[in-house]
Design a protein with these regions (language model features):
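Short beta->alpha junction loops/turns
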Residues: 22, 69-72, 96-97, 123
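Glycine-rich, highly charged phosphate/nucleotide-binding loops
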Residues: 71-79
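Glycine-rich, flexible N-terminal cofactor/catalytic loop recognition
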Residues: 2-70
């Protein structure tokens, strides 16, 4: 299994990017997340209608693929082929970190099995936010 985390995306560095998205305020996205999403050939979205709000705000024009709990198994072979053909593919959820109470775990497991790079892009965290205001 190859898991990488780098501060700057190199040109044409393919793999599956797990990109965290804002939990409430669209301005809470990181610069790195925007950079990765703009360089992605494809963005896998839990709900393209919800994701479009975020992507439009930051002028991100990557191709969208709907990837939710009802079609993620069906999409799996197509997405793996994209990743094997050196495409940059990002996975986002409607809010927060993909694969945590969201679709994506099946794809991540398949990438691990196929030795495809997985690059996490951290972002806002409900846990750290809750802890910070707990006193």
């Amino acid at each position: 299994m190859i898991i990488k985390s780098k501060s700057i995306l190199k040109d044409n560095e393919n793999g599956l990017y797990l990109v965290s998205t804002p939990i409430g305020n669209l301005k809470d996205i990181t610069f790195r997340a925007i950079e990765v999403l703009k360089k992605s050939s494809y963005i896998l979205c839990e709900d393209t209608r919800v994701s479009k709000n975020l992507l439009d705000k930051y002028d991100i024009k990557s191709k969208l693929i709907s990837n939710h709990k009802f079609n993620e198994t069906k999409n799996l072979s197509k997405i793996i082929e994209l990743l094997k053909s050196d495409e940059i593919v990002s996975l986002i959820s409607d809010a927060g970190t993909p694969s945590i109470s969201d679709p994506g775990a099946i794809l991540v497991n398949e990438c691990i099995n196929k030795n495809i790079k997985i690059i996490p892009i951290p972002g806002p965290s409900a846990v750290s936010t809750a802890v910070s205001i707990s006193g």
